Protein backbone atom coordinates (compact mmCIF):
# COMPACT_ATOMS: atom_id res chain seq x y z
CA UNK A 1 0.00 0.00 0.00
CA UNK A 2 1.01 3.63 -0.50
CA UNK A 3 0.35 6.91 1.35
CA UNK A 4 0.15 5.04 4.66
CA UNK A 5 1.62 7.93 6.65
CA UNK A 6 -1.14 10.25 5.39
CA UNK A 7 -3.63 8.52 7.68
CA UNK A 8 -1.55 7.94 10.80
CA UNK A 9 -3.23 9.70 13.78
CA UNK A 10 -5.77 11.32 11.45
CA UNK A 11 -9.21 11.86 13.02
CA UNK A 12 -11.66 10.16 10.68
CA UNK A 13 -15.43 9.71 10.94
CA UNK A 14 -16.91 6.73 9.11
CA UNK A 15 -20.59 7.54 8.55
CA UNK A 16 -22.73 4.47 7.96
CA UNK A 17 -21.59 0.86 8.01
CA UNK A 18 -22.71 -2.03 5.78
CA UNK A 19 -19.92 -3.71 3.80
CA UNK A 20 -18.24 -0.55 2.54
CA UNK A 21 -18.27 1.23 5.89
CA UNK A 22 -16.97 -1.77 7.83
CA UNK A 23 -14.08 -2.33 5.42
CA UNK A 24 -13.24 1.37 5.24
CA UNK A 25 -13.11 1.51 9.05
CA UNK A 26 -10.89 -1.57 9.24
CA UNK A 27 -8.51 -0.21 6.61
CA UNK A 28 -8.27 3.18 8.32
CA UNK A 29 -7.65 1.52 11.69
CA UNK A 30 -4.91 -0.59 10.11
CA UNK A 31 -3.32 2.59 8.70
CA UNK A 32 -3.19 4.10 12.18
CA UNK A 33 -6.08 6.55 11.88
CA UNK A 34 -8.15 7.56 14.90
CA UNK A 35 -11.45 6.08 13.75
CA UNK A 36 -14.93 6.94 14.98
CA UNK A 37 -17.77 4.92 13.48
CA UNK A 38 -21.34 6.23 13.45
CA UNK A 39 -24.27 4.04 12.36
CA UNK A 40 -28.04 4.50 12.80
CA UNK A 41 -28.76 0.89 13.75
CA UNK A 42 -28.96 0.25 17.50
CA UNK A 43 -25.85 -1.32 19.04
CA UNK A 44 -27.55 -4.46 20.38
CA UNK A 45 -28.71 -5.38 16.86
CA UNK A 46 -25.57 -4.13 15.13
CA UNK A 47 -23.09 -6.98 14.73
CA UNK A 48 -20.74 -4.87 12.61
CA UNK A 49 -20.56 -2.14 15.25
CA UNK A 50 -19.93 -4.72 17.97
CA UNK A 51 -17.02 -6.23 16.03
CA UNK A 52 -15.45 -2.83 15.29
CA UNK A 53 -15.69 -1.87 18.97
CA UNK A 54 -13.98 -5.15 19.90
CA UNK A 55 -11.24 -4.27 17.41
CA UNK A 56 -10.55 -1.04 19.29
CA UNK A 57 -12.52 1.53 17.35
CA UNK A 58 -14.84 4.13 18.83
CA UNK A 59 -18.45 3.32 17.94
CA UNK A 60 -21.56 5.53 18.18
CA UNK A 61 -24.87 3.97 17.17
CA UNK A 62 -28.62 4.58 17.21
CA UNK A 63 -28.65 7.93 15.41
CA UNK A 64 -26.49 10.39 13.49
CA UNK A 65 -25.80 13.15 16.08
CA UNK A 66 -24.83 16.35 14.27
CA UNK A 67 -23.02 17.61 17.38
CA UNK A 68 -20.48 14.82 16.87
CA UNK A 69 -18.96 16.98 14.14
CA UNK A 70 -17.88 19.53 16.76
CA UNK A 71 -14.98 17.16 17.49
CA UNK A 72 -12.97 18.52 14.53
CA UNK A 73 -12.68 15.44 12.35
CA UNK A 74 -10.24 15.78 9.46
CA UNK A 75 -12.10 13.45 7.09
CA UNK A 76 -15.52 11.83 6.63
CA UNK A 77 -15.82 8.51 4.80
CA UNK A 78 -19.51 8.34 3.92
CA UNK A 79 -21.53 5.26 3.09
CA UNK A 80 -22.54 5.77 -0.56
CA UNK A 81 -26.23 5.24 0.19
CA UNK A 82 -26.41 8.21 2.58
CA UNK A 83 -27.54 11.24 0.54
CA UNK A 84 -25.83 14.61 0.65
CA UNK A 85 -29.07 16.05 2.04
CA UNK A 86 -28.43 14.18 5.31
CA UNK A 87 -27.95 16.72 8.17
CA UNK A 88 -24.60 15.18 9.16
CA UNK A 89 -23.29 15.48 5.62
CA UNK A 90 -24.60 19.03 5.18
CA UNK A 91 -22.95 20.07 8.45
CA UNK A 92 -19.65 18.47 7.39
CA UNK A 93 -19.82 20.39 4.11
CA UNK A 94 -20.45 23.64 5.99
CA UNK A 95 -17.33 22.90 8.06
CA UNK A 96 -15.35 22.32 4.81
CA UNK A 97 -14.57 18.79 5.96
CA UNK A 98 -13.39 16.52 3.11
CA UNK A 99 -16.09 13.91 2.38
CA UNK A 100 -15.22 10.80 0.39
CA UNK A 101 -16.68 7.38 -0.32
CA UNK A 102 -14.89 4.08 0.23
CA UNK A 103 -13.55 3.62 -3.36
CA UNK A 104 -11.68 6.93 -3.06
CA UNK A 105 -10.02 5.74 0.14
CA UNK A 106 -9.06 2.48 -1.58
CA UNK A 107 -7.63 4.33 -4.57
CA UNK A 108 -5.49 6.58 -2.37
CA UNK A 109 -3.71 3.62 -0.76
CA UNK A 110 -3.71 1.15 -3.67
CA UNK A 111 -0.68 0.64 -5.91
CA UNK A 112 -2.62 -1.29 -8.56
CA UNK A 113 -3.84 -0.01 -11.93
CA UNK A 114 -7.59 0.67 -12.04
CA UNK A 115 -10.26 -0.07 -14.60
CA UNK A 116 -13.54 1.58 -13.58
CA UNK A 117 -16.97 0.61 -14.88
CA UNK A 118 -20.20 2.56 -14.44
CA UNK A 119 -23.56 2.91 -16.20
CA UNK A 120 -27.24 2.41 -15.50
CA UNK A 121 -27.35 -1.21 -16.68
CA UNK A 122 -24.74 -3.84 -17.42
CA UNK A 123 -22.12 -2.74 -14.87
CA UNK A 124 -21.84 -6.03 -13.02
CA UNK A 125 -21.73 -8.23 -16.12
CA UNK A 126 -19.19 -5.98 -17.86
CA UNK A 127 -17.02 -5.82 -14.73
CA UNK A 128 -17.12 -9.60 -14.40
CA UNK A 129 -16.28 -10.17 -18.07
CA UNK A 130 -13.30 -7.81 -17.93
CA UNK A 131 -11.94 -9.52 -14.82
CA UNK A 132 -12.37 -12.99 -16.32
CA UNK A 133 -10.72 -12.00 -19.61
CA UNK A 134 -7.74 -10.37 -17.90
CA UNK A 135 -7.26 -13.41 -15.68
CA UNK A 136 -7.66 -15.78 -18.62
CA UNK A 137 -4.67 -14.03 -20.22
CA UNK A 138 -2.70 -13.55 -16.97
CA UNK A 139 -4.09 -15.52 -14.03
CA UNK A 140 -4.51 -14.04 -10.54
CA UNK A 141 -3.66 -10.44 -11.44
CA UNK A 142 -7.13 -8.89 -11.88
CA UNK A 143 -9.50 -8.36 -8.96
CA UNK A 144 -13.20 -7.46 -9.27
CA UNK A 145 -14.45 -5.11 -6.58
CA UNK A 146 -16.76 -2.22 -5.76
CA UNK A 147 -20.50 -2.15 -6.25
CA UNK A 148 -20.25 -5.77 -7.44
CA UNK A 149 -20.29 -6.77 -3.76
CA UNK A 150 -16.62 -6.87 -2.71
CA UNK A 151 -15.50 -3.59 -1.10
CA UNK A 152 -12.56 -2.03 -2.94
CA UNK A 153 -10.87 -1.18 0.36
CA UNK A 154 -10.72 -4.90 1.11
CA UNK A 155 -9.07 -5.67 -2.23
CA UNK A 156 -6.72 -2.65 -2.13
CA UNK A 157 -4.84 -4.11 0.83
CA UNK A 158 -3.71 -7.24 -1.01
CA UNK A 159 -2.87 -6.05 -4.54
CA UNK A 160 0.44 -4.79 -5.89
CA UNK A 161 1.79 -2.67 -8.73
CA UNK A 162 1.47 -5.51 -11.25
CA UNK A 163 -2.21 -6.08 -10.48
CA UNK A 164 -5.41 -4.52 -11.79
CA UNK A 165 -8.48 -3.58 -9.78
CA UNK A 166 -11.61 -3.89 -11.94
CA UNK A 167 -14.04 -1.69 -10.04
CA UNK A 168 -17.79 -1.44 -10.56
CA UNK A 169 -18.65 2.11 -9.47
CA UNK A 170 -22.18 3.34 -8.78
CA UNK A 171 -23.31 6.93 -9.15
CA UNK A 172 -23.54 7.11 -5.34
CA UNK A 173 -19.91 6.05 -4.99
CA UNK A 174 -18.70 8.37 -7.74
CA UNK A 175 -20.17 11.40 -5.98
CA UNK A 176 -17.55 10.90 -3.27
CA UNK A 177 -14.35 10.56 -5.30
CA UNK A 178 -11.64 13.22 -5.40
CA UNK A 179 -8.49 11.73 -6.95
CA UNK A 180 -9.69 8.33 -8.23
CA UNK A 181 -8.18 7.96 -11.68
CA UNK A 182 -8.89 4.80 -13.68
CA UNK A 183 -6.52 4.21 -16.58
CA UNK A 184 -9.52 2.75 -18.42
CA UNK A 185 -13.06 3.95 -17.67
CA UNK A 186 -16.21 2.34 -19.08
CA UNK A 187 -19.66 3.95 -19.34
CA UNK A 188 -22.04 1.18 -20.43
CA UNK A 189 -25.13 3.38 -20.90
CA UNK A 190 -27.25 6.03 -19.18
CA UNK A 191 -30.99 5.75 -18.63
CA UNK A 192 -33.42 7.08 -16.02
CA UNK A 193 -32.44 5.85 -12.54
CA UNK A 194 -32.01 6.98 -8.94
CA UNK A 195 -33.58 10.36 -9.65
CA UNK A 196 -35.03 10.41 -6.12
CA UNK A 197 -31.47 10.34 -4.74
CA UNK A 198 -29.81 12.68 -7.25
CA UNK A 199 -32.70 15.12 -7.55
CA UNK A 200 -32.76 15.25 -11.35
CA UNK A 201 -31.33 13.59 -14.43
CA UNK A 202 -28.61 16.20 -14.92
CA UNK A 203 -27.17 15.43 -11.49
CA UNK A 204 -27.32 11.70 -12.19
CA UNK A 205 -25.46 12.08 -15.49
CA UNK A 206 -22.90 14.38 -13.85
CA UNK A 207 -22.28 11.75 -11.17
CA UNK A 208 -21.66 9.07 -13.80
CA UNK A 209 -19.27 11.35 -15.68
CA UNK A 210 -17.10 11.77 -12.59
CA UNK A 211 -15.52 8.45 -13.57
CA UNK A 212 -13.50 10.31 -16.21
CA UNK A 213 -12.87 13.59 -14.40
CA UNK A 214 -9.26 12.76 -13.43
CA UNK A 215 -8.32 11.02 -16.66
CA UNK A 216 -5.63 12.41 -18.96
CA UNK A 217 -4.88 12.02 -22.69
CA UNK A 218 -2.88 8.90 -21.74
CA UNK A 219 -6.07 7.20 -20.51
CA UNK A 220 -9.08 5.63 -22.25
CA UNK A 221 -12.82 6.24 -21.89
CA UNK A 222 -15.02 3.50 -23.39
CA UNK A 223 -18.52 4.72 -24.29
CA UNK A 224 -21.70 3.33 -25.85
CA UNK A 225 -21.83 5.03 -29.26
CA UNK A 226 -25.37 3.80 -29.95
CA UNK A 227 -26.68 6.44 -27.53
CA UNK A 228 -26.59 9.96 -29.07
CA UNK A 229 -26.12 11.53 -25.63
CA UNK A 230 -22.71 9.86 -25.37
CA UNK A 231 -21.35 11.83 -28.32
CA UNK A 232 -21.91 15.07 -26.41
CA UNK A 233 -20.73 13.70 -23.07
CA UNK A 234 -17.49 12.53 -24.68
CA UNK A 235 -16.48 16.18 -25.13
CA UNK A 236 -16.19 16.50 -21.34
CA UNK A 237 -13.40 13.91 -21.10
CA UNK A 238 -9.68 14.48 -21.62
CA UNK A 239 -9.14 10.76 -22.22
CA UNK A 240 -8.99 8.99 -25.58
CA UNK A 241 -12.56 8.00 -26.46
CA UNK A 242 -13.01 4.34 -27.41
CA UNK A 243 -16.58 3.86 -28.69
CA UNK A 244 -18.41 0.53 -28.86
CA UNK A 245 -21.55 -0.13 -30.90
CA UNK A 246 -24.05 -2.92 -31.49
CA UNK A 247 -25.64 -0.94 -34.35
CA UNK A 248 -22.64 -0.09 -36.56
CA UNK A 249 -22.27 3.47 -35.27
CA UNK A 250 -19.62 5.34 -37.21
CA UNK A 251 -16.26 5.52 -35.46
CA UNK A 252 -16.84 2.62 -33.06
CA UNK A 253 -13.80 0.43 -32.41
CA UNK A 254 -15.63 -2.51 -30.78
CA UNK A 255 -18.60 -3.41 -32.98
CA UNK A 256 -21.13 -6.07 -33.92
CA UNK A 257 -20.67 -6.49 -37.69
CA UNK A 258 -22.66 -9.10 -39.63
CA UNK A 259 -23.13 -11.12 -36.45
CA UNK A 260 -19.45 -10.96 -35.46
CA UNK A 261 -17.90 -9.34 -32.39
CA UNK A 262 -15.05 -7.23 -33.75
CA UNK A 263 -12.36 -4.82 -32.58
CA UNK A 264 -10.78 -2.35 -35.00
CA UNK A 265 -12.40 -4.34 -37.81
CA UNK A 266 -10.87 -7.70 -36.82
CA UNK A 267 -13.32 -10.53 -36.21
CA UNK A 268 -13.07 -12.20 -32.81
CA UNK A 269 -16.06 -14.57 -32.66
CA UNK A 270 -19.70 -14.86 -33.65
CA UNK A 271 -22.08 -13.32 -31.15
CA UNK A 272 -24.21 -16.46 -31.40
CA UNK A 273 -21.39 -18.41 -29.72
CA UNK A 274 -21.80 -16.43 -26.49
CA UNK A 275 -23.21 -18.41 -23.58
CA UNK A 276 -25.18 -15.44 -22.19
CA UNK A 277 -28.25 -14.44 -24.23
CA UNK A 278 -29.67 -11.08 -25.24
CA UNK A 279 -28.77 -7.95 -27.18
CA UNK A 280 -27.89 -6.18 -23.94
CA UNK A 281 -25.21 -8.80 -23.28
CA UNK A 282 -23.72 -8.22 -26.73
CA UNK A 283 -23.26 -4.60 -25.64
CA UNK A 284 -21.68 -5.72 -22.36
CA UNK A 285 -19.34 -8.04 -24.27
CA UNK A 286 -18.31 -5.26 -26.68
CA UNK A 287 -17.51 -2.93 -23.78
CA UNK A 288 -15.44 -5.66 -22.12
CA UNK A 289 -13.65 -6.48 -25.38
CA UNK A 290 -12.69 -2.83 -25.83
CA UNK A 291 -11.27 -2.67 -22.29
CA UNK A 292 -9.19 -5.83 -22.46
CA UNK A 293 -7.96 -5.21 -26.01
CA UNK A 294 -6.45 -1.96 -24.73
CA UNK A 295 -4.67 -4.12 -22.15
CA UNK A 296 -3.28 -6.48 -24.79
CA UNK A 297 -5.53 -9.48 -24.15
CA UNK A 298 -5.60 -11.94 -27.04
CA UNK A 299 -8.62 -13.21 -28.94
CA UNK A 300 -8.29 -16.75 -27.56
CA UNK A 301 -8.77 -15.50 -23.99
CA UNK A 302 -11.79 -13.42 -25.02
CA UNK A 303 -13.38 -16.33 -26.87
CA UNK A 304 -12.86 -18.74 -23.98
CA UNK A 305 -14.61 -16.42 -21.53
CA UNK A 306 -17.55 -15.52 -23.77
CA UNK A 307 -18.15 -19.14 -24.76
CA UNK A 308 -18.20 -20.38 -21.16
CA UNK A 309 -19.45 -17.49 -18.98
CA UNK A 310 -23.03 -18.33 -17.99
CA UNK A 311 -23.87 -14.95 -16.49
CA UNK A 312 -23.71 -13.14 -13.19
CA UNK A 313 -25.70 -14.95 -10.54
CA UNK A 314 -29.42 -14.02 -10.59
CA UNK A 315 -29.04 -11.91 -13.78
CA UNK A 316 -30.36 -13.99 -16.70
CA UNK A 317 -28.02 -16.67 -15.36
CA UNK A 318 -27.97 -19.91 -17.33
CA UNK A 319 -28.42 -22.83 -14.93
CA UNK A 320 -29.10 -26.12 -16.68
CA UNK A 321 -30.52 -27.84 -19.72
CA UNK A 322 -33.09 -30.36 -18.50
CA UNK A 323 -34.54 -32.69 -21.12
CA UNK A 324 -33.98 -30.09 -23.85
CA UNK A 325 -35.27 -27.12 -21.83
CA UNK A 326 -32.77 -24.35 -21.03
CA UNK A 327 -33.33 -22.88 -17.55
CA UNK A 328 -32.43 -19.29 -16.59
CA UNK A 329 -32.41 -17.51 -13.23
CA UNK A 330 -33.18 -13.78 -13.45
CA UNK A 331 -34.28 -13.20 -9.85
CA UNK A 332 -32.60 -9.77 -10.00
CA UNK A 333 -35.45 -8.62 -12.30
CA UNK A 334 -37.36 -6.73 -9.61
CA UNK A 335 -39.24 -4.42 -11.97
CA UNK A 336 -40.99 -4.33 -15.34
CA UNK A 337 -37.96 -2.85 -17.14
CA UNK A 338 -35.65 -5.67 -16.08
CA UNK A 339 -38.18 -8.36 -16.98
CA UNK A 340 -38.62 -6.71 -20.38
CA UNK A 341 -34.90 -7.13 -21.06
CA UNK A 342 -35.10 -10.81 -20.10
CA UNK A 343 -38.17 -11.57 -22.23
CA UNK A 344 -36.55 -9.88 -25.21
CA UNK A 345 -33.35 -11.90 -24.73
CA UNK A 346 -34.72 -15.15 -26.19
CA UNK A 347 -35.94 -16.30 -29.58
CA UNK A 348 -37.24 -19.62 -28.20
CA UNK A 349 -40.70 -20.04 -26.61
CA UNK A 350 -40.61 -19.05 -22.93
CA UNK A 351 -42.33 -20.58 -19.93
CA UNK A 352 -42.25 -17.56 -17.65
CA UNK A 353 -42.17 -17.69 -13.84
CA UNK A 354 -43.17 -14.30 -12.40
CA UNK A 355 -44.56 -12.60 -9.33
CA UNK A 356 -43.60 -10.97 -6.05
CA UNK A 357 -44.21 -7.85 -4.00
CA UNK A 358 -47.07 -5.64 -5.18
CA UNK A 359 -45.85 -2.04 -5.22
CA UNK A 360 -48.98 -0.79 -6.93
CA UNK A 361 -47.09 -0.09 -10.15
CA UNK A 362 -48.59 -0.53 -13.64
CA UNK A 363 -47.48 -3.68 -15.44
CA UNK A 364 -49.54 -3.43 -18.63
CA UNK A 365 -46.41 -2.84 -20.73
CA UNK A 366 -45.63 -6.55 -20.34
CA UNK A 367 -48.75 -7.73 -22.19
CA UNK A 368 -47.42 -7.34 -25.77
CA UNK A 369 -44.13 -8.96 -24.75
CA UNK A 370 -45.98 -11.93 -23.30
CA UNK A 371 -48.00 -12.24 -26.49
CA UNK A 372 -44.79 -12.22 -28.55
CA UNK A 373 -42.42 -14.38 -26.47
CA UNK A 374 -44.30 -16.44 -23.85
CA UNK A 375 -46.11 -19.77 -24.37
CA UNK A 376 -47.17 -20.29 -20.73
CA UNK A 377 -46.92 -18.57 -17.34
CA UNK A 378 -46.57 -19.75 -13.74
CA UNK A 379 -47.27 -16.91 -11.29
CA UNK A 380 -46.89 -16.52 -7.52
CA UNK A 381 -46.70 -13.91 -4.75
CA UNK A 382 -48.71 -10.73 -4.19
CA UNK A 383 -48.67 -9.78 -7.88
CA UNK A 384 -49.99 -13.19 -8.99
CA UNK A 385 -53.47 -11.78 -9.85
CA UNK A 386 -51.90 -8.93 -11.86
CA UNK A 387 -49.57 -11.30 -13.70
CA UNK A 388 -52.43 -13.73 -14.36
CA UNK A 389 -54.44 -10.90 -15.94
CA UNK A 390 -51.48 -10.04 -18.19
CA UNK A 391 -51.32 -13.66 -19.31
CA UNK A 392 -55.08 -13.77 -19.91
CA UNK A 393 -55.00 -10.52 -21.91
CA UNK A 394 -52.16 -11.94 -24.01
CA UNK A 395 -54.01 -15.21 -24.61
CA UNK A 396 -51.42 -17.28 -22.73
CA UNK A 397 -52.21 -20.16 -20.30
CA UNK A 398 -51.52 -19.24 -16.66
CA UNK A 399 -51.09 -21.36 -13.53
CA UNK A 400 -51.02 -19.82 -10.05
CA UNK A 401 -48.90 -21.37 -7.32
CA UNK A 402 -47.47 -20.59 -3.89
CA UNK A 403 -43.84 -19.68 -4.53
CA UNK A 404 -40.74 -20.22 -6.66
CA UNK A 405 -40.12 -23.73 -5.33
CA UNK A 406 -43.58 -24.96 -6.33
CA UNK A 407 -43.46 -23.08 -9.64
CA UNK A 408 -40.51 -25.01 -11.08
CA UNK A 409 -42.14 -28.46 -11.51
CA UNK A 410 -45.27 -26.80 -12.92
CA UNK A 411 -43.13 -24.95 -15.47
CA UNK A 412 -41.45 -28.19 -16.50
CA UNK A 413 -44.80 -29.92 -17.02
CA UNK A 414 -46.04 -27.29 -19.49
CA UNK A 415 -42.70 -26.93 -21.31
CA UNK A 416 -41.29 -28.96 -24.17
CA UNK A 417 -37.75 -29.60 -25.49
CA UNK A 418 -36.50 -26.42 -27.16
CA UNK A 419 -38.30 -24.13 -24.70
CA UNK A 420 -36.76 -21.73 -22.20
CA UNK A 421 -37.85 -21.85 -18.54
CA UNK A 422 -37.25 -18.35 -17.20
CA UNK A 423 -37.56 -16.94 -13.68
CA UNK A 424 -37.81 -13.17 -14.17
CA UNK A 425 -40.25 -12.00 -11.48
CA UNK A 426 -40.87 -8.37 -12.56
CA UNK A 427 -41.31 -7.64 -8.85
CA UNK A 428 -39.33 -7.31 -5.64
CA UNK A 429 -39.02 -10.36 -3.41
CA UNK A 430 -40.01 -8.91 -0.03
CA UNK A 431 -43.49 -10.43 0.10
CA UNK A 432 -41.92 -13.88 0.54
CA UNK A 433 -38.13 -13.53 0.71
CA UNK A 434 -35.65 -11.18 2.44
CA UNK A 435 -34.01 -10.31 -0.90
CA UNK A 436 -33.77 -11.35 -4.55
CA UNK A 437 -30.68 -13.47 -3.83
CA UNK A 438 -32.58 -15.79 -1.47
CA UNK A 439 -35.40 -16.03 -4.01
CA UNK A 440 -32.89 -16.92 -6.72
CA UNK A 441 -31.18 -19.48 -4.50
CA UNK A 442 -34.55 -21.14 -3.87
CA UNK A 443 -35.08 -21.31 -7.62
CA UNK A 444 -31.66 -22.90 -8.10
CA UNK A 445 -32.48 -25.51 -5.43
CA UNK A 446 -35.79 -26.31 -7.10
CA UNK A 447 -34.11 -26.63 -10.52
CA UNK A 448 -31.48 -28.99 -9.09
CA UNK A 449 -34.23 -31.10 -7.51
CA UNK A 450 -36.11 -31.17 -10.81
CA UNK A 451 -33.00 -32.21 -12.71
CA UNK A 452 -32.35 -35.07 -10.29
CA UNK A 453 -35.95 -36.24 -10.60
CA UNK A 454 -35.96 -36.10 -14.41
CA UNK A 455 -32.61 -37.87 -14.71
CA UNK A 456 -33.74 -40.60 -12.31
CA UNK A 457 -36.66 -41.33 -14.63
CA UNK A 458 -39.36 -40.36 -12.14
CA UNK A 459 -40.78 -37.74 -14.52
UniProtKB/Swiss-Prot annotation:
Its EC number is 6.3.2.9. Gene3D superfamilies: Mur ligase, C-terminal domain, Mur-like, catalytic domain, NAD(P)-binding Rossmann-like Domain. It catalyses: UDP-N-acetyl-alpha-D-muramoyl-L-alanine + D-glutamate + ATP = UDP-N-acetyl-alpha-D-muramoyl-L-alanyl-D-glutamate + ADP + phosphate + H(+). The keyword Nucleotide-binding applies. One of its GO terms (molecular function) is UDP-N-acetylmuramoylalanine-D-glutamate ligase activity. Keywords: ATP-binding, Cell cycle, Cell division, Cell shape, Cell wall biogenesis/degradation, Cytoplasm, Ligase, Nucleotide-binding, Peptidoglycan synthesis. One of its GO terms (cellular component) is cytoplasm. It is an enzyme of class 6 (ligase). The keyword Calcium does not apply. Pathway: Cell wall biogenesis; peptidoglycan biosynthesis. ATP binds at residues 119-125. It comes from the Bacteria. It is found in: Cytoplasm. One of its GO terms (biological process) is regulation of cell shape. SUPFAM superfamilies: MurCD N-terminal domain (SSF51984), MurD-like peptide ligases, catalytic domain (SSF53623), MurD-like peptide ligases, peptide-binding domain (SSF53244). Belongs to the MurCDEF family. Cell wall formation. Catalyzes the addition of glutamate to the nucleotide precursor UDP-N-acetylmuramoyl-L-alanine (UMA). This is UDP-N-acetylmuramoylalanine--D-glutamate ligase. The lineage of its organism: Bacteria, Bacillati, Bacillota, Bacilli, Lactobacillales.
Amino acid sequence: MKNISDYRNKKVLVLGLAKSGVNAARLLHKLGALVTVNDKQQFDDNKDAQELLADGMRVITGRHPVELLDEHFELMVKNPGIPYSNPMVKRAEALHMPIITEPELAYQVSEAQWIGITGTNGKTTTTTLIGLMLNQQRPHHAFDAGNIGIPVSQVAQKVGKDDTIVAELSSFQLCGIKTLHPHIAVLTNIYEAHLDWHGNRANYVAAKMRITMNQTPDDYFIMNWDLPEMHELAKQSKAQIVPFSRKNAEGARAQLIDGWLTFDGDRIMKASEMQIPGLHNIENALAAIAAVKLEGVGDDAIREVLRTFSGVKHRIQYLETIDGRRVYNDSKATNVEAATVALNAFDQPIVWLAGGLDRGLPMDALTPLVKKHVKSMVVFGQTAPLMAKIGKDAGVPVQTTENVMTAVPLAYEVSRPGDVILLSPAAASWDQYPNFEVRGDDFIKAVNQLKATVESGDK
